[in-house]
């Protein structure tokens, strides 16, 4: 049966067991593997506009729904940066990828940088778009007054679980708009797809657990100095991170190539897909 999410998707959708859960991923094309990993409370559809810019006769696209996101299952675990990184590492091994370009956005970017710091042999280059490694109680609080309320109260007892479940399409459109320079760049139907997937078993608990583990994303920065892989560090000029935080990452990651995208917020994959695709095809 065609689901609201899958009706927008190419037919190359797969599922596999990874680290105690079932992970949905898109796999299409042939050539250099390019792995896409999204951010919190979103899913692989975030990258469809970027994927459309790529020549899949030259690259093999793998886009992942993280555990507890999209149509992947939500195991009853603590959703730390380490847990997500282990899950993605397990999928890379399962797919037996080699010399992959890793494209991550927000927490997806942080996952890519942690994998690079671990010296994961399956990755050749990381394109880290707006890594999520800053902000007391979570960087998303900086995005708008509404999101400050949402991402603060989700941490509270009693109210937190209620907020985690309150993902109507209308509310999610407002939340996502906090990550965009131009809110008209939000694709029609995306908020509805995310809302539907957020109602799947365990997903609200996973979302709140991820938010409660905000310190694990900040502490990941201590690992960046161990990175030896090439890294393209990409920031929207209107990202939630502060210029000093971006400069610190550029200094801490050996040899990082820093790129700033104009008129771009946190969700660069939605606002500037052509520019992201160009960095993938010519990362240096």
What are these regions (language model features)?
Residues 1-35, 56-59, 97-98, 181, ...:
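Alpha/beta-hydrolase fold catalytic core
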Residues 19, 26, 62-107, 117, ...:
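Active-site loop/oxyanion-hole signature of alpha/beta-hydrolase fold enzymes
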Residues 21-71:
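Conserved HGGG/HGGXW glycine-rich cap/lid loop of the alpha/beta-hydrolase fold
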Residues 54, 226-264:
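Conserved loop-alpha-helix segment in the C-terminal half of the alpha/beta-hydrolase fold
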Residues 109-120, 126:
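Short glycine-enriched nucleophile-adjacent loop
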Residues 117, 125-159:
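Flexible "cap/lid" loop of the alpha/beta hydrolase fold
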Residues 137-141, 163-225:
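Conserved alpha/beta-hydrolase catalytic His-Asp/Glu region
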Residues 264-277:
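Catalytic histidine-centered segment of alpha/beta-hydrolase-like enzymes
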């Amino acid at each position: 049966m065609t689901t609201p999410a899958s009706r927008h998707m190419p037919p190359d959708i797969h599922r596999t067991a990874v680290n105690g859960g079932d992970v949905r991923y898109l796999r299409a094309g042939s050539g250099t593997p390019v792995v896409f990993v999204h951010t919190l409370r979103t899913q692989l559809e975030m990258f469809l506009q970027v994927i459309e810019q790529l020549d899949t006769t030259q690259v093999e696209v793998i886009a992942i729904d993280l555990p507890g996101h999209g149509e992947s299952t939500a195991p009853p675990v603590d959703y730390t940066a380490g847990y997500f990184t282990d899950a993605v590492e397990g999928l890379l091994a399962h797919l037996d990828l080699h010399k992959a370009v890793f494209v991550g956005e927000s927490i997806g970017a942080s996952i890519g940088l942690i994998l690079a710091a671990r010296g994961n042999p399956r990755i050749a280059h990381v394109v880290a778009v707006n890594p999520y490694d800053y902000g007391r109680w979570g960087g998303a609080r900086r995005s708008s007054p509404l999101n400050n309320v949402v991402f603060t109260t989700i941490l509270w007892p009693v109210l937190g679980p209620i907020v985690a479940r309150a993902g109507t399409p209308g509310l999610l459109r407002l939340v996502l708009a906090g990550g965009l320079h131009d809110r008209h760049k939000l694709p029609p139907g995306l908020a509805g797809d995310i809302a539907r997937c957020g109602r799947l078993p365990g997903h609200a608990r996973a979302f709140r657990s991820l938010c409660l583990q905000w310190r694990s994303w900040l502490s990941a920065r201590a690992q960046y100095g161990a990175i030896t892989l090439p890294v393209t560090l990409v920031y929207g000029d209107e990202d939630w991170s502060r210029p000093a935080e971006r400069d610190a990452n550029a200094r801490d990651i050996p040899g990082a190539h820093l790129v700033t995208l104009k008129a771009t917020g946190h969700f660069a994959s939605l606002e500037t897909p052509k520019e992201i695709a160009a960095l993938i095809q010519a990362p240096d």
